[in-house]
Amino acid sequence: MANSLRNVNDYDPFKYRPSYFDLEAPTESFALGKFVDAIEVKQMALDAFSESSMVSIATSQLPKTAYTATSFIESEYYSFPYLFNDQKYYWDYFDYKIPAADFAVLELELDLNNQQDQQIKDHFIDPAIKAYKQLGDSTGLFATKPLTEYQNDTHYLLGYPVVPTDHTQLWECKQGAERFSYGYFYSNMARLTKNLRQGDPNAGSKTHIEYSNELLDKDSMDQGIVRFSTFLGANINYHDYDYRQQGYGLTLTDTNLPGGSSGSLVFNQDKKISSIYSAATESDSVGYAQLLRTPRDVNGISVVSQSYDLIFGDSNTKRYYAMFAKKQQTHLYSEILKSTDEQYRYVVDKQFN
């Protein structure tokens, strides 16, 4: 979503890239969508997504890009072996690519004098705040643990698949509400997960990155954990720059969700956010989620080649979300100031340009 947002009033450096904006029209509207209340997701899937199952409403203003996980660590190199004339060579494919992770945060300003924005607050924002408080209302919402411990977790993917919204309506507004429509393109969208669409001739749509199963070897995946720097095809173009995905992720079975699901939060059984759903493999059998926090070591033992913390930062992470939270004095930063746990307070004494 952050890559498709072209808001000329966005924060620097996201608002202007000459060749990018010359080729693409700016974003003119932005909408939030959700399932209507009291409808069972599974039943909706079996009903092939009736048009009344999802509703959406346009915001009065376009969002801004608060944070993207770009240039967040030093570039990690990985050499691929190959044979030529029976000689073995090593090829480093990534020396010119900027590191990136599939994680971004958008900021949306609401004008509560606007009826549509007030409805968004009532029906989208307030329920999210309520859920956040029920989960602890604290920095402890974001999981961090040794990579090997994730294999014992149960993972819950939040968010919603894309469904057609041509004839649905959210709330009656006197002035009317211009809603985003996906049109006929998604009229035959496949269902939620593979187990719900068995027998369907359509395997479903994949998100914006595809990974080859040929690279799922012992060097790239171990007990459900993947090291993105080993993936030859994990390249991303964002605002006219070439990036490659780095860091660590989860490999999740039966999670080839339809396009639009990328960016959904992944929780574990402890109700903590561990990662962001990213993409599916070419075979549609395995999905990936980008881990947000990977500790440098556990009990003094190094467990990763490169640690990073996209939320709170650490000595190895150059850009992280808490930098924006500190600059804007957000609620998260006030929670960081209250905490005595050093894993959250890295940003407090840091000075930024």
UniProtKB/Swiss-Prot annotation:
InterPro entries: Flavi_NS3_S7, Uncharacterised_MG067. Pfam families: Peptidase_S7. Disulfide bonds: none annotated. It comes from the Bacteria. GO terms for molecular function: ATP binding; RNA binding; RNA helicase activity. Belongs to the MG067/MG068/MG395 family. This is Uncharacterized protein MPN_591.
